């Protein structure tokens, strides 16, 4: 089974600090590497995290404020240098096309990799690969900003003891999957009698935004919600003025969405530590963590 986990490569907001780099988040999922919002210095963060940049297959830019995209050009150049053979898919708001091009071609280099652009102009399902799908929703920020949801489908798992007891094997198994009900030796067998549904995982990634319904929709029953929480509640006026959230507001979104786990990120440089973020959010949503650089949050496939 391939590794599944979310690695924090950076968790600061507009200004990096001595201990927090610009944001960048790597989701390794079903054999793919999904990189979200690579800020300045991201390729160096891969070195510190002891992860090869070549795992990246898809790059997501929520919006084109610098702390969410300044690492894009250097990451593409690094992937060229490493001569990756797989295409690099890039997803971003269509209104930011000119900024994407400026970042991609900001320096002189010989591009050899295949970059597949996905400028997104409407909400909904962006792509569906069968084993997972990508959804985008418009957030409430100062510029066009997208939030993301990565979802894998539910799967049917057979219960071996019940399959054996029912005398099922070979082609008749596929017939049961296709029809949902079959007759075997004068017995009616329903799919739900000999199987259970394994709920597919989903992860929501929410960058800069005020609280909004789109966040709740993206994070609905998600296993992980990675959510910006730039400020503490004592600076709620700054959050409102700059179209950001507090830790409390992020927790409220997670609670409304009934997410399983909340990871706070995008911390303002005014805060030296993040303990208060966890404390503030935890009063509303207990299963909460503050992102830490190079920490990985693993999530093996659900057993049920």
Curated annotation (Swiss-Prot):
InterPro entries: Metallo-B-lactamas (IPR001279), RibonucZ/Hydroxyglut_hydro (IPR036866), RNase_Z/BN (IPR013471)
N-terminal signal peptide: none
Binding site for Zn(2+) 1: 63, 65, 141, 208
MF-aspect GO terms: 3'-tRNA processing endoribonuclease activity; zinc ion binding
Binding-site positions, Zn(2+) 2: 67-68, 208, 266
Keyword list, A-Z: Endonuclease, Hydrolase, Metal-binding, Nuclease, tRNA processing, Zinc
EC number: 3.1.26.11
SUPFAM superfamilies reported for this sequence: Metallo-hydrolase/oxidoreductase (SSF56281)
Reported cofactor(s): Zn(2+)
CC cofactor note: Binds 2 Zn(2+) ions.
Domain of life of the native organism: Bacteria
Active-site residues from the entry: 67 (proton acceptor)
Catalytic activity reported: Endonucleolytic cleavage of RNA, removing extra 3' nucleotides from tRNA precursor, generating 3' termini of tRNAs. A 3'-hydroxy group is left at the tRNA terminus and a 5'-phosphoryl group is left at the trailer molecule
Subunit structure: Homodimer.
Family indicated by similarity: Belongs to the RNase Z family.
HAMAP family for this protein: RNase_Z_BN (MF_01818)
Protein task: Zinc phosphodiesterase, which displays some tRNA 3'-processing endonuclease activity. Probably involved in tRNA maturation, by removing a 3'-trailer from precursor tRNA.
Name the UniProt record assigns to this protein: Ribonuclease Z
Organism for this UniProt entry: Chlamydia muridarum (strain MoPn / Nigg)
């Amino acid at each position: 089974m391939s590794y599944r986990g979310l690695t924090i490569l950076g968790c600061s907001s507009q200004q990096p600090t001595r201990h927090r780099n610009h944001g960048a988040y790597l989701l390794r999922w079903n054999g793919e590497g999904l990189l979200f919002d690579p800020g300045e210095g991201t390729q160096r963060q891969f070195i510190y995290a002891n992860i090869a940049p070549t795992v990246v297959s898809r790059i997501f830019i929520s919006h084109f404020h610098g702390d969410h995209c300044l690492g894009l050009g250097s990451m593409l150049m690094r992937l060229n240098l490493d001569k990756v053979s797989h295409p690099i898919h890039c997803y971003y708001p269509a209104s930011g096309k000119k900024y994407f091009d400026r970042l991609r071609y900001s320096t002189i280099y010989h591009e050899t990799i295949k970059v597949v652009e996905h400028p997104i102009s409407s909400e909904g399902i962006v792509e569906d690969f069968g084993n997972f799908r990508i959804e985008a929703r418009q957030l409430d920020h100062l510029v066009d900003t997208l939030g993301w949801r990565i979802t894998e489908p539910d799967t049917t798992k057979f219960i071996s003891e019940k399959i054996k007891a029912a005398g099922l094997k070979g082609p008749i198994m596929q017939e049961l999957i296709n029809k949902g009900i079959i007759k075997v030796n004068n017995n009616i067998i329903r799919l739900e009698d000999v199987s259970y549904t394994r709920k597919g995982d989903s992860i929501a990634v929410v960058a800069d935004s005020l609280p909004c319904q789109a966040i709740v929709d993206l994070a609905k029953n998600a296993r992980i919600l990675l959510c910006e929480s730039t400020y503490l509640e004592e600076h709620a006026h700054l959050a409102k003025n700059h179209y950001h959230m507090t830790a409390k507001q992020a927790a409220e979104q997670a609670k409304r969405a009934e997410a399983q786990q909340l990871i706070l990120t995008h911390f303002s440089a005014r805060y030296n530590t993040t303990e208060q973020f966890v404390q503030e959010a935890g009063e509303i949503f207990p299963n909460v963590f503050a992102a830490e650089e190079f920490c990985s949050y693993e999530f093996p496939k659900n057993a049920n």
